[in-house]
């Protein structure tokens, strides 16, 4: 193929999609950065117009001077994302979307290998800033170890539309770039037969794994307070909603049935479905409810425990 020696004078088709990256006055490559949110399913209206804003968590928390991932309290649903990013300077991009992307043909969407996604392409300024660090560190063996300091994390906020929930299962950053071809051992630039610098297409992918924490911030409307204040009944709303406490009269049962032998005890809690609703889509009643002893509730979720029939 055609080799490009001058990063400032690339082909028009490349120039439209790639940003020139400079280290000082020297051009070191052309770069494009895309961030994907992959989801396997959704809840609600497939065609409701929604919008998300994506921010880099590049702000260190006041008092500790550390990024969010060093804060042990940052992994709970009451996390305050505002402590770790700036609304004006940390914006990576915004994207309008629907759960079912009609711009993708039916033949593609119906493939068993197709996974829907929402994509954000970083603008020129952000690409220059992040691309410079990645291109400079890209030739080192420990790039992935350094990545956390180069890009501490991202925060995605749903700021328009409330008719759809995406069940995101993976986040991926793809960095595609043109750079000088270099000797794999010496690191020296390779040249063409005409003596010009050789340029190659290359890329890096940074994909979330189990070790990459996905913390969810959930906020409830003011109407939830009406449910909390009711005295004739209680509600269950999870996660980050209403957590009802049930007190079991163990002492009273013991005093009354202390001399009896019980093989099994059944706990029954009657539930009532909402009779009417103005919502087009409603979640079905859960098939089971998790009961956890109060003193064990924090450890249960922190340690990813399963119900054992004793503590939960």
What annotation goes with each model-predicted range?
Residues 1-312:
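Secreted, disulfide-rich extracellular signaling modules
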């Amino acid at each position: 193929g055609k080799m490009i020696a001058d990063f400032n004078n690339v082909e028009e088709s490349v120039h439209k999609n790639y940003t020139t990256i400079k280290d000082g006055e020297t051009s070191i490559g052309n770069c494009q950065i895309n961030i994907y949110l992959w989801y396997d399913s959704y809840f609600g209206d497939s065609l409701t117009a929604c919008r998300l804003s994506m921010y880099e968590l590049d702000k260190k928390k006041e008092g500790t001077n550390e990024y969010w991932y060093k804060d042990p309290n940052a992994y709970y649903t009451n996390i305050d994302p505002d402590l770790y990013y700036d609304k004006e300077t940390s914006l990576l991009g915004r994207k309008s979307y629907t759960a079912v992307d009609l711009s993708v043909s039916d033949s593609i969407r119906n493939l068993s290998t197709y996974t829907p996604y929402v994509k954000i392409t970083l603008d020129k300024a952000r690409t220059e800033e992040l691309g410079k660090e990645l291109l400079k560190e890209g030739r080192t063996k420990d790039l992935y170890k350094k990545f956390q300091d180069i890009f501490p994390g991202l925060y995605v906020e749903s700021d328009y539309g409330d008719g759809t929930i995406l069940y995101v299962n993976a986040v991926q950053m793809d960095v595609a770039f043109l750079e000088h071809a270099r000797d794999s051992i010496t690191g020296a630039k390779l040249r063409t037969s005409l003596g010009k610098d050789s340029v190659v297409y290359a890329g890096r992918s940074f994909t979330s794994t189990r070790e990459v924490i996905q913390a969810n911030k959930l906020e409830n409307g003011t109407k939830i307070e009406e449910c909390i204040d009711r005295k004739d009944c209680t509600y269950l709303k999870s996660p980050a909603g209403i957590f009802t406490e049930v007190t079991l009269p163990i002492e009273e049962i013991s005093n009354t049935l202390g001399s009896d032998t019980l093989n099994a005890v059944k706990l029954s809690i009657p539930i009532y479905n909402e009779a009417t609703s103005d919502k087009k889509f409603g979640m079905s009643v859960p098939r089971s409810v998790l009961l956890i002893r109060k003193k064990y509730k924090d450890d249960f979720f922190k340690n990813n425990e399963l119900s054992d029939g004793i503590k939960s």
